Swiss-Prot record:
<feature type="repeat" description="LRR 10">
    <location>
        <begin position="231"/>
        <end position="253"/>
    </location>
</feature>
<feature type="modified residue" description="Phosphoserine">
    <location>
        <position position="949"/>
    </location>
</feature>
<dbReference type="InterPro" id="IPR001611">
    <property type="entry name" value="Leu-rich_rpt"/>
</dbReference>
<feature type="repeat" description="LRR 1">
    <location>
        <begin position="23"/>
        <end position="44"/>
    </location>
</feature>
<feature type="modified residue" description="Phosphoserine">
    <location>
        <position position="1288"/>
    </location>
</feature>
<feature type="compositionally biased region" description="Basic and acidic residues">
    <location>
        <begin position="663"/>
        <end position="676"/>
    </location>
</feature>
<comment type="subunit">
    <text>Interacts with CNKSR2 and DLG4. Interacts with CTNND2/Catenin delta-2. Forms a complex with N-cadherin through CTNND2. Interacts with CAMK2A.</text>
</comment>
<feature type="modified residue" description="Phosphoserine">
    <location>
        <position position="439"/>
    </location>
</feature>
<dbReference type="InterPro" id="IPR036034">
    <property type="entry name" value="PDZ_sf"/>
</dbReference>
<feature type="region of interest" description="Disordered">
    <location>
        <begin position="1196"/>
        <end position="1218"/>
    </location>
</feature>
<feature type="region of interest" description="Disordered">
    <location>
        <begin position="822"/>
        <end position="899"/>
    </location>
</feature>
<keyword id="KW-0433">Leucine-rich repeat</keyword>
<feature type="region of interest" description="Disordered">
    <location>
        <begin position="1134"/>
        <end position="1158"/>
    </location>
</feature>
<keyword id="KW-0963">Cytoplasm</keyword>
<feature type="repeat" description="LRR 12">
    <location>
        <begin position="277"/>
        <end position="298"/>
    </location>
</feature>
<feature type="repeat" description="LRR 14">
    <location>
        <begin position="323"/>
        <end position="344"/>
    </location>
</feature>
<keyword id="KW-0770">Synapse</keyword>
Amino acid sequence: MTTKRKLIGRLVPCRCFRGEEEIISVLDYSHCSLQQVPKEVFNFERTLEELYLDANQIEELPKQLFNCQALRKLSIPDNDLSSLPTSIASLVNLKELDISKNGVQEFPENIKCCKCLTIIEASVNPISKLPDGFTQLLNLTQLYLNDAFLEFLPANFGRLVKLRILELRENHLKTLPKSMHKLAQLERLDLGNNEFSELPEVLDQIQNLRELWMDNNALQVLPGSIGKLKMLVYLDMSKNRIETVDMDISGCEALEDLLLSSNMLQQLPDSIGLLKKLTTLKVDDNQLTMLPNTIGNLSLLEEFDCSCNELESLPPTIGYLHSLRTLAVDENFLPELPREIGSCKNVTVMSLRSNKLEFLPEEIGQMQRLRVLNLSDNRLKNLPFSFTKLKELAALWLSDNQSKALIPLQTEAHPETKQRVLTNYMFPQQPRGDEDFQSDSDSFNPTLWEEQRQQRMTVAFEFEDKKEDDESAGKVKALSCQAPWDRGQRGITLQPARLSGDCCTPWARCDQQIQDMPVPQSDPQLAWGCISGLQQERSMCAPLPVAAQSTTLPSLSGRQVEINLKRYPTPYPEDLKNMVKSVQNLVGKPSHGVRVENSNPTANTEQTVKEKFEHKWPVAPKEITVEDSFVHPANEMRIGELHPSLAETPLYPPKLVLLGKDKKESTDESEVDKTHCLNNSVSSGTYSDYSPSQASSASSNTRMKVGSLQATAKDAVHNSLWGNRIAPPFPQPLDAKPLLSQREAVPPGNIPQRPDRLPMSDAFPDNWTDGSHYDNTGFVSEEAAGENANNNPLLSSKARSVPAHGRRPLIRQERIVGVPLELEQSTHRHTPETEVPPSNPWQNWTRTPSPFEDRTAFPSKLETTPTTSPLPERKDHMKEPTETPGPFSPGVPWEYHDPTPNRSLGNVFSQIHCRPDSSKGVIAISKSTERLSPLMKDIKSNKFKKSQSIDEIDVGTYKVYNIPLENYASGSDHLGSHERPDKFLGPEHGMSSMSRSQSVPMLDDEMLMYGSSKGPPQQKASMTKKVYQFDQSFNPQGAVEVKAEKRIPPPFAHNSEYVQQPSKNIAKDLVSPRAYRGYPPMEQMFSFSQPSVNEDAMVNAQFASQGPRAGFLRRADSLASSTEMAMFRRVSEPHELPPGDRYGRATYRGGLEGQSSISMTDPQFLKRNGRYEDEHPSYQEVKAQAGSFPAKNLTQRRPLSARSYSTESYGASQTRPVSARPTMAALLEKIPSDYNLGNYGDKTSDNSDIKTRPTPVKGEESCGKMPADWRQQLLRHIEARRLDRTPSQQSNILDNGQEDVSPSGQWNPYPLGRRDVPPDTITKKAGSHIQTLMGSQSLQHRSREQQPYEGNINKVTIQQFQSPLPIQIPSSQATRGPQPGRCLIQTKGQRSMDGYPEQFCVRIEKNPGLGFSISGGISGQGNPFKPSDKGIFVTRVQPDGPASNLLQPGDKILQANGHSFVHMEHEKAVLLLKSFQNTVDLVIQRELTV
């Protein structure tokens, strides 16, 4: 009858059914593209009981609708409602109300009149609080408020005594009202992705609770009170910072599913064996060294996952698990299996990948039901003959490169025992460790490797591919998690298909080479990069005393690293790629690094580091002396990478590349670095909720800290690196949580202690606050946040927490991009400092989050690590000023002069660029860059002679290529804040530092500049660098030797000024997805390394190259050209920018372009497409800026919206009971048009920043495609609305934290990723700061483009058009900082390789409206063009309206009248657009197909 009634409802005029007309009670108008409620609905107001208006574009509900007194169910999800009319009180019979996925900001107070309401679904709305009247809905049984902006619940919330289901995922809750103990009927409570630092006390009083989600929070302990929940069946505590589980958990007698993945557990309580009903136990991605024997009591256990731990044996009692069906023990250190394993006869899937198995017990043949067995990456020489009994075996994986699931086995006689064994051509297995690396290094083909890597990079950056990569990274985690290098190789080989067909072999080679490389410098670097990335991902616990180890690396090399490597979770495809790049860099760089480092012998470096960084990392931060910090930016970076940063550098081995002072040292260093990386990455990884990438990001970010924070940053970085995993105390990381590094920001006090290698937890607590740590996307911001954290604990923690969540993916690549040779050196220098950390890499490493967590974060970690490293190394650098001193002596970042410098420092680029030491000819290139540009790699490692236009760079001299990158300049600007700062720094600082590798070196330079305006810059300047000028085809025209001195002085002067400020800004920038991910093009890196012929030009070139560098990294095939272009562009741009601009504006521009690191996607995209993107920086920059907002950090903590929840969660544990939460698909559906710009003109502007989530027309798309994290980014994008809200709130928090940082914050023009822009509500909170922040974002853009709207962009607080430095955007930017992480990730996901993003200025005259609709934004419903993009997109244009000939669907709005829409809330964007008077000047990004 219902169908008939629906039909009748549509055929009202038909008299045949007139008799039944009055009986019509249900009308369904779902998916009808309605813009208003159909009038025929009112014809049935007396009888209508159910009305469905799902997925339309309805913006308001007519009053007449509320005359339908009989209405019982009103369903209007996925529309454009901005408010719920008060007349809803007249629907007294309403029982179900669904307003999810709209723009509703609050419930009307008189909702209390709807006494019959039993179900309310209001998820994915920017609701910041519930009215008091809400608690009078006493019949409410189900309440869904996922992905809103709730910071607290009403005190009398306990009045809703009939509540059975309460879902509050992805909000900003820190506590629960005590009255909730009255909710005696509550069965399901979802508090995932919030900001709880401890389990709410009231929880143990809700006795009837059956399902509890507390994942993605900041819990450090699982208290025994949880054992009071006798009815609890499902408990998800994954992605927290839990170090201990209380014995009393055994009280949960009914518990069936226990998810403890991605925490910091070192042991499980014996009482776990009392959970007799347990069917699923997931403890993967922790730091377990053993399992309790009581595990055998879990007789009903069906699924057991203990992958990515440090297990050296399985208890024999495992044989009692007779119900076990799935057993995963990947990435541990098992030398053998217990014979009792054969008693698990029901196991169908068993994965033992990446262990140290040398033989299998005969009893394995008793597992008759075994269908899938993964033995790859072990050391098996053969298989027992009993394998012939496994009749159901369908897949036997013996190698990551295996072409078929089942390869025939032959019977042979064991050479010693003469027993029959099974073997085939894949035996004996070659360990991925040292042996493999060594064996492969001999046959390593740099050219082939480069080509394959480029291909991989391209795939990684493609939108869809990226998605797959991300997924594969997550999926492959179990498979590809191996020793750090193993991971690199294996991850690559395992996921080569995902990355690219040829990826596997190159990776394997890379890994092998890395292993070999530990002996040769270049190899060690490669190995180290790979290992480092892996380690970071793995977050090895013990940060080996890398500082001491940079020299010690050789001793550490190989074995230890191998262990660490195994520990790391499999990197995402991108991570793998990055690792490969790192390996390449290591291989190629070693000679350079060696030479350079030869100048500074390992011992010397260590001594230097030790002397200068006696404090170890903490001291550096304490020292804040720009000079010291900058003196050894490269070394410090290296050390940081190796040690503290290493934790996060794993994904960015190139960045971490230990370009050894000697090849040997390099080799050893690579090993040590790997270990360190592992350790640090572990910490950071653990800390970052999501993934090793995050951890990496944190590390990298930390490192990025520049200037005054530099010393602090060093400490913070170090600590944060360790603390990434270790510092659970970091509470606000809920959002940042995914980014361990971010989350675990070390408090300013702690930062100085870094040299002491604070316990991971100690180190992480504050440093991880760095917003940049959290996300790849917002990596720059994160790091900046970290630095800010050093200066301002509040800010740092917030910033860090936000980015941690969503940015890792992007960051990872970016991080990898720039590792200056000096960085490597810095790693060496850092080694002495790192020495302090436990010699066992595992001890301090907090495990990085599992691949599922978002490996992309790791890249950022890597980058962060370098940042940290450079800081300590800065001291060293003082000794070798020639390299670092350069223009960045003051510590100005290449991109951001003031706040930006710190940010830059945090960036990989900064790390790379900071080591112009003549002794260190090594040019570290971030892995991404390497990957993208063979040239970069080549440059990084003299070994690598790439066929690309860029020639190898001499160790002694850096060749800077002046690439015509005017477009790239914007691209470079986009590329990353890190890069930007270089660019800006360059001109002001003379770009002397430019001698360092552009991406990292610039950051390093920034750091140096910030650290002090000492002679070191001059020393660096003294370094002769070669600048290559590229023709437009990007072919080197010739090398010009240039000295860095010119650059050095200007940077120092300005940078010193911004030393402290920059650190804060840098963090944000680091956070920015684009900024972070915009790795300086290789050339940029080169340009750092080598003074340009024209300092200014060089500076520009460096900055430019950095911008392209991101592109470089992103796009393997057009690496050279993009790099060249970027370089050229940057070279010219800095000249164009006035010093004020450079610092405020230019640096800002760097920041913007750094944000454009996010926007780097744009340049990258252009690079991919071979076009320059300078003209479009604003959009991408805006996006990048949003990406780098620390505010995002908070958001990142809760990266997943209710819908993306499952996707983002780790593995199955993520699955949650069915709920009303909208599905991903639903979210995507909603994406098309969040708001109608015509109606919400004003709102659009603000929200666009937040909602600009939709794919940027070009750069964004590229960016989105870029991230290996694409899949997660997509989820985040979908969550973008939530994120928007969260980011905005976070941004507010960041604002608070970073306001003191505002001087640098203004700089922050951290690239505000679209996601970084806080939602409307949050923007309101942020107030002018936020707007300023947005403005600064645009400003960065603008700087690049020098668009007329820059001032407007910044107009809220300050007109960014004016010098950004004075602008107090920082706080607002800081506010947005948290979002950068997400932005970064999303950016990654969104970057499209299909078209070139073009930016246009459009002027529209209202008549009366604007004539177009928008969707996306932080709190928007997403957009149909680039779901992972949180930007504001045009979805509809009225044919004959004011915008008919100017806009077209798919255009991404970057700015409106100077307001940055990059990470703006949808609602704010709409309000902004509506608020504009007659003329609206838009800066849009349009993706043009090739």
